[in-house]
Amino acid sequence: TGEGEVWAKGDNVMKGYYLEPEMTAEVITPDGWFRTGDLGHLDKDNYLSIRGRLKNMIVGSSGENIYPEEIESVINDFGHVIESLVVQQKGKLVAMVHVNIEELQAKYQQMKKDISDQAELLVEEYLEELRRYVNSKVNKYSQLQLVVYQPEPFQKTATLKIKRFLYY
């Protein structure tokens, strides 16, 4: 079993970027291998699973590799979460979470009469509940110290990927 960057080679793999020799040299090795930028893991049966992107990997305080996409996947499975982003801030893992506030208010409206006075408190309770849930599902060094409410949707690329660099 091994872990590292996924490389690909074959007739169906690109030969480089059009009229961009510098960019091509960054991703194509001299012997023709394409460096995908994906982090992969081979299991005991030689099946490849993608852990995340090399440029997104966070190195923890003890040197362990933390894959934010794995944590984001757990967060995004939690009720009322629309999207999330995990970053490292001042040495701590922080999740920024965009939730469906209307669904969340509707959920709590059934339990509490005057929700308008308590909306901020309900969001804080929800985020703490989310943090505990995620920490029960991930390994020790991938534990979140803070979950932050993201009031607006994250800015995205044309391919609908979150522009991570805007949130560091």
Where do the language-model regions lie?
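Conserved adenylate-forming
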Residues: T1-E3, D11, K90-V94, I101-Y108
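Conserved ATP-binding/catalytic segment of the ANL
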Residues: G2-G60
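Adenylate-forming
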Residues: V13, Y47-V74, E103-L121, K140-L144
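Acidic-histidine catalytic/liganding microenvironments
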Residues: D31, F78-G79, Y141
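C-terminal boundary motif of the adenylate-forming
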Residues: L39, D77-E102
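Generic structural signal for well-ordered beta-strand positions
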Residues: D43, S49, I66, T157, ...
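Residue-level signal for inorganic ion chemistry
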Residues: N46, I75, A95, V147, ...
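Conserved C-terminal "lid"/linker of ANL adenylate-forming enzymes
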Residues: E83, G91, E129-Y168
